[in-house]
Curated annotation (Swiss-Prot):
Enzyme class: oxidoreductase
GO cellular component: chloroplast
Tissue-wise expression: Primarily in cotyledons and hypocotyls of greening cucumber seedlings.
Miscellaneous: During catalysis, the active site Cys acts as a nucleophile attacking the alpha-carbonyl group of tRNA-bound glutamate with the formation of a thioester intermediate between enzyme and glutamate, and the concomitant release of tRNA(Glu). The thioester intermediate is finally reduced by direct hydride transfer from NADPH, to form the product GSA.
MF GO annotations: glutamyl-tRNA reductase activity; NADP binding
A GO biological process held by the record: chlorophyll biosynthetic process
Active-site residues, record numbering mapped to chain: 151
NCBIfam families for the chain: hemA, PRK00045.1-3
Protein's name according to its UniProt entry: Glutamyl-tRNA reductase 1, chloroplastic
Keyword Metal-binding: no
Keywords assigned: Chlorophyll biosynthesis, Chloroplast, NADP, Oxidoreductase, Plastid, Porphyrin biosynthesis, Transit peptide
Organism this protein belongs to: Cucumis sativus
Residues the record lists as binding substrate: 150-153, 210, 215-217, 221
């Protein structure tokens, strides 16, 4: 990857010194509490969140500047100077092969950096992902996009024509759609670029970034991103390739390591939390109510059964899903109730699990305060375990004396116990992720030669056609078709023979880094020798076209 040169040396040096000073305490905290492996994953999140500087690539100027450009007016260039980063880059003579290409960027907020109160406002339902992709790709500096929105994270992946401008536009879009001020989003978000972004989605897919390390549900959610993205124009080649490769990595990690062995899911952690809060003698007798029979609700039911629960009430919009679950678990008494009877069922329950896609609260303080008290055999407290995002249960209910509400952020208490063992297993997974990240970046680099191949062939074809016409005109109009065809075939054969060598040097599958480096050097050499259009000009044209389209 070439280094962008958007900043002068003095300004860059000052910025890096300031960022290093600000992040020193964070580094000390990370190293003192986490093992080496965990530090390599988490430090990247923390440093991006607080400084915008990657601990791995401190000399990526746009990367180092992206957070500051959005939030700090002192470092923004004067408004009178409207030179874009691309124009500055064109005049730079740092490296004869230096150029800027589209960057993969992730703008994210997760359970590690952001409270559930903010995540629920930013959450995008799966049905809205295509619309969100369309709106994101309508921004001036965004080419491709994908949305990964779960109960633990809200992450937007984009291919940006300019890093800091793309981040600024996406952050403003997030603010507009959620109603959260840009400044507040910037306090909690993390930013990752190119290889760091690649490693992040691979870690996510492998379950290394989950609250419950190694859990399998996130892989299904990554698959769903690809499924929903198929046919959506903005889910382009780079983003599609990234997520498909992430699925491969997630499968490989689970196959080649034992990270998934004994791992708990969010649903099982919710059940464990409920049992931790109940007196042990009441585990078999507590009255259980599950609201929502979707994927999460079904898993809650399965884990309750695994813990010895033989009777429960399930409230759902329709009976069809509950019937299907009942067929799977014929030895368990599962009683279906419609949503209209939700409050009456709650009055008769000791523990209530909520896992619906409702965007509004199902339970408010006014609804719960008049419910009859629960027995002392279950501790005298009615428990609400809310694993929905947005939340289904109002936090103010916790103010009632005989009620306790727990949400997904409270599950950390459960997973802490067996996290150390899975961290050891995760070390094995990290080597796989590093290897796969290199392969993906090499594949992406190899794509750069495709436009040059097309341009070189088109250039040769223009010359062939022009010279063929000259030849045929000199031969006269009465030449036989057979002769005309033979001359045409001759010209094509000569061109193909001449192009064979250069084309071979431009084709690379990305598997060999040495070959890839030579291929990219050959590409730049051919661009210069034949005055082919440069990648910088392509980026400028794309940005100009998007701006003009948005102004119509």
């Amino acid at each position: 990857m070439a280094v962008s040169t958007s900043f002068s040396g003095a300004k860059l040096e000052a910025l890096l010194f300031k960022s290093a000073s600000n992040s020193s305490s964070t580094r000390n905290l990370s190293s003192s509490h986490l093992p080496g492996f965990c530090k390599s994953i988490r430090t990247r999140r923390i440093l991006f969140q607080r400084t915008g500087v990657s601990s791995f690539t401190p000399f990526k100027c746009e990367l180092a500047s992206s957070d500051v450009l959005v939030q700090n007016d002192e470092i923004d260039p004067p408004k009178s100077s409207n030179l874009s980063a691309l124009e500055q880059l064109k005049t730079s003579a740092v490296d004869r092969y230096t150029k800027e290409r589209s960057s993969i960027v992730v703008i994210g907020l997760s359970i590690h950096t952001t409270p559930v109160e903010m995540r629920e406002k930013l959450a995008i339902p799966e049905a809205e992902w295509p619309r969100a992709i369309g709106e994101l790709c309508g921004l001036n500096h965004i080419e491709e996009a994908a949305v990964l929105s779960t109960c633990n994270r809200m992450e937007i992946y984009v291919v940006a024509l300019s890093q800091h401008r793309g981040v600024k536009e996406v952050t403003e879009w997030m603010s507009k759609t959620s109603g959260i001020p840009v400044s507040e989003i910037c306090q909690h978000r993390f930013l990752l670029y190119n290889n760091d972004a690649t490693q992040h989605i691979f870690e996510v897919s492998a379950g290394l970034d989950s609250l419950v390390l190694g859990e399998g549900q996130i892989l299904a959610q990554v698959k769903q991103v690809v499924k929903v993205g198929q046919g959506v124009a903005g889910f382009g080649r780079n983003i599609s390739g990234l997520f498909k490769h992430a699925i491969t990595v997630g499968k490989r990690v689970r196959t080649e390591t034992n990270i998934a062995a004994g791992a708990v899911s969010v649903s099982s952690a919710a059940v464990e939390l409920a049992l931790m809060k109940l007196p042990e003698p009441s585990h078999a007798t507590a009255r259980m109510l599950v609201i929502g029979a979707g994927k999460m609700g079904k898993l809650v039911i399965k884990h309750l059964v695994a813990k010895g629960c033989t009777k429960m009430v399930v409230v759902n919009r329709s009976e069809e899903r509950v019937t299907a679950i009942r067929e799977e678990m014929k030895d368990v008494e599962i009683i279906y109730k419609p949503l209209t009877e939700m409050l009456s069922c709650t009055a008769e329950a000791d523990v209530i699990f909520t896992s619906t896609a409702s965007e509004s609260l199902l339970f408010t303080k006014e609804q719960v305060k008049d419910l009859p008290p629960v027995g002392h055999d279950v501790g005298g407290l009615r428990l609400f375990i809310d694993i929905s995002v947005p939340r289904n249960v109002g936090a103010c209910i916790n103010n009632l004396e005989d009620v306790r509400v727990y949400n997904v952020d409270d599950l950390k208490e459960v997973v802490a116990a067996n996290k150390e063992d899975r961290l050891r297993k995760a070390m094995e997974a990290q080597s796989i992720i590093t290897e796969e990240s290199k392969q993906f970046e090499a594949w992406r680099d190899s794509l750069e030669t495709v436009p040059t191949i097309k341009k070189l062939r088109a250039y040769a074809e223009r010359i062939r056609t022009a010279e063929l016409e000259k030849c045929l005109s000199k031969m006269g109009d009465d030449i036989p078709k057979k002769t005309r065809r033979a001359v045409d075939d001759l010209s094509r054969g000569i061109v193909n023979k001449l192009l064979h060598g250069p084309m071979q040097h431009l084709r690379c599958d990305g598997s060999d880094s040495r070959t890839l480096s030579e291929t990219l050097e050959n590409m730049h050499a051919l661009n210069r020798m034949f005055s082919l259009e440069t990648e910088i000009a392509v980026l400028e044209q794309k940005i100009r076209a998007k701006v003009e389209q948005n102004q119509k």
